[in-house]
């Protein structure tokens, strides 16, 4: 059990800490990441990633090297989009509407979605273990 939040809400962080539930707040500034970590977050969602850059992760890790970061919001299911985030130190990436396209869902084209997921997982595996790519 865990909670993912779209924003860094201190009251939610305090509540989660009090009941022992991990939370993953959404942060868009270094200050928000700092406050989230102060409130017990070990994992932070960088949102919206498409308005930030992988350099943001490197900057955060320069002052908070132990925090794990997940860019979400605008990360595309392509190697060109994913690789810079991993190169900067992202733990993983979050994808929603970029991976599960409305038109594919509306058409019932679940095979296309499944193939895209496999492709993305292959990209990630190659980034995590370059000797096997």
Language-model segment annotations:
Residues 1, 15-24, 63-72:
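Short beta-strand/loop segments at the ligand-binding rim of alpha/beta enzyme cores
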Residues 1-8, 21-29, 33-34, 42-51:
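Catalytic beta/alpha-barrel core
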Residues 7-12, 45-54, 89-109:
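Glycine-rich phosphate-binding active-site loops on the catalytic face of alpha/beta enzymes
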Residues 16-18, 86, 102-132:
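C-terminal helical cap(s) of enzyme catalytic domains, especially alpha/beta-barrels
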Residues 19-20, 39-40, 65, 88-89:
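Short, structured coil segments at secondary-structure junctions
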Residues 31-39, 76-93:
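Catalytic cores of alpha/beta
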Residues 63-66, 78, 109:
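Mobile acidic interaction elements
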């Amino acid at each position: 059990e865990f909670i993912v939040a779209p924003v860094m809400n201190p009251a939610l962080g305090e509540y989660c800490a009090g009941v022992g539930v991990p939370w993953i707040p959404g942060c868009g500034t270094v200050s928000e990441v700092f406050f989230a970590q102060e409130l017990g977050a070990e994992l932070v969602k960088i949102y919206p990633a498409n308005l930030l850059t992988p350099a943001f992760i490197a900057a955060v890790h320069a002052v908070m090297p132990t925090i794990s970061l997940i860019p979400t919001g605008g990360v595309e299911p392509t190697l060109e989009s994913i690789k810079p985030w991993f190169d900067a130190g992202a733990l993983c990436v979050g994808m929603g509407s970029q991976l599960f396209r409305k038109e594919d869902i509306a058409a019932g084209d679940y095979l296309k979605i499944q193939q895209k997921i496999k492709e993305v997982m292959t990209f990630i595996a190659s980034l995590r273990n370059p000797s096997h790519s």
